[in-house]
Every structure is written in C-alpha cells, then in structure tokens.
C-alpha cells in the first residue's frame, strides 16, 4: 500500500468506529429510556423508543455499506481485514442490543407498576449493570484495549447472578400473586432481555480482543443463562 | 472479469451456499431433537444438542472466512457482492437459530414432563411450524426464489398466533398450578425461542428477497411478539 492508500484506509476505519460508537450510544440510551418508561408506565415514551430503533438499524446498514466498500476497494490484509470484519460483526450485535430495548418498550403497556412494585424495582439495577457493560466494551473497542475487553467478560457473571435472582423472585411473586402472573411473565422476559444484553456485550468483548490481538479469548461459557430446576 | 475469474467466483459462491445449507440442516435437526429430548426428559440427548452447536458455530466461521476471501480476492460488483453479503448475514442468522435449539436443550433438565403434560403438548407443533419456515427459506435461498421468500414471511403470522395462544395457556396453567410455575416459566421461554426462530426465518426471507431482486420486501412488522396486557 502507498501512503495515500494507508491514509484513506485509516479514514474509512475511523468512520466505521465513529458509526459504531454512535450506534452504541443510541442503544444504551434506549435501554435506559425503556426502564424509565417502564417505571412511569409511560406509553408515549415507549412508542418513541420503538420508533427510534429505526435509527440504529439505519446506522447498521451504513456500517455494512462502508465495510463492504472498504474491503472491495482497499483490499486490506491480515490485521486491517480482521478489524473491518470485527466492525461489521460488532455493528450487528449492537443492532440486536437496540432490539432488546425496543422489545422492553413494547412490554410497557402490559405492565402496570402499581401491582408489581416489588420485582419492578430490581430491573433498573440490572439494566444499569448491562448498559455499563455495553459502554465499557465500546470504549475497549475504541481504545483497542484487550485488557478492558477481558474485564467486560468478568462483569457478565454479576449480570447472570442478578438474572438468576430476579427469576427466583418473580417465580415466588407469581406463586403469591396469581392475579399478576401475566404481568410477572412480561417482567421475566424483560429480565431475560437484559441478561442477553450482557451476553452480547461479552460477545463484542471477545471480538474486540480478537481484533486487537489475533488470539481468541478462550472458550468461555456463552449463551442463555438457565436457572436450575426447582429454583 | 475474464472467464476464469467468473468461474472461480461461481465456485466460491456455490461453496458458500453449500455451507449455509449444511448449517441450516443442522439447526433444523437440533430444534427437532430438542423437542424430542424435552418430551422424553432425555438429559443425555440434551447434552448432545448443546455440544453439537459448536459444529454450527464452526461452519459460520468458515462462511465468514470464505466470504471475506471472496470479496477481497474477486472484488465482486453489484449483484454478486449483494449475494456474498447476504450469505454472510444469513449464516449469522442460522447460527442464532442453532443457539435457540441449544437454549431449549438447556431447559430440558428444568422441566419434568409429568407435571406439565398439557402445555408441553403444544410446543412440538409450534416447533414444526418454525422449522418448516427455516427449511422453506433455505430452499428459497438455494433456488434464488423471491416468491418462495414472500410465502415464508406469510407463514410467520401463524407462528406468532400460536405463540400468543401458548402464552395465554401457560399463564392460565400457572394460575391453576402454582407449584409448577417455575417449570411453566421455562416453557414460556421455550415458546419464545421458537417464536424467535420464526422471526429469524422471516429475516432470512427478506435477505433472500433482497439478494434476488435488489428490492426490499417492504416494511413488515418485525421483532418480538408481545401478547396484549391482561391476556
């Protein structure tokens, strides 16, 4: 590559990083806003979150277009190619995090805070832990910091523990409040969505680690957290 | 492109299609097997499904490697590039469908068929509808058939209706059987996983349509199905 090509590549990859940071900021804000709408049973705010998800989707399309153009025109090799592919995949994951915020917003109408006060108070704390992971992992991506990525993976254990505790709390709540079972079931899905946000942040952390080092972080346990039977 | 390049591209894209067909077959079989393990409370079969998911993940990595090589070396334009990007994204979605089978398998231990016979009988029928969509959409991809892709999207409505009906059945069951609430909650997640399989097949259908025609199928309602409050 000549100097001009290198500079053009750096500009493109900088643009990719900027788009992903923008997506991440929107996804994080959408999750915070969904918790707020839930607490206040604010249907208008929920509708805005659902509608706002389109913006994240559009940014993902822009990332794809740019990444494909970059691969096709600049034919990056090794490290650079690994970084473009990581950006493409990270954008896909952040888009899914945005979808979780949208899904939570869709449940606002189904949950009336007054009748399910107790378990409702646990969700925002869990949401904070999950969005914290998203923020940290995107910072790690921007800084190409593999150590920060490892720390994000460690945070995921706390989110999983929190999820298991909410699952048990909600099942107990259902047993004691059969009239609120439908609402509690919706809250169970919200807790699961937040747990998945943590999983996705972990996935991104692994991609950041791989893009920065060329090595895999090792076979960590991924995927759905299933509390033990009878819990 | 000269004749040699065209032929090499066709071979590569054929290999991509073959890998995706293989992934789809494995994902479909994993969902069927998870229903079977659930009905028979077969923990060994469940463990095999969980372990087998790695194979689908490895195939996705192979698709990525091949697609990136194809874009970088052959620099495909317009229609061809659209098809490679579609293949890349479709592989990602099929990998997620495999994850749902794994997640269902993880819940086998938490569900004892004897105490939840009634709602348990509904899940395999829903699973059949969802895997039918997966099979049809991968056939549509192999045949580059946009009309078949549209039909897959239409099938998704039936899966969503089924999900809403299972949600109501399970909530009623929980009210009447407070001791089985934890198990019923796991079944709710299984039903939700199957509903998401249908959504993902719909996403793939839209990619197949776009890859084949260059047009978007139109703004269909996507994402999480949330039954109405009080249902």
Regions found by a protein language model. Name each.
Chain A
Residues 1-231:
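Cytosolic, long alpha-helical scaffolding segments
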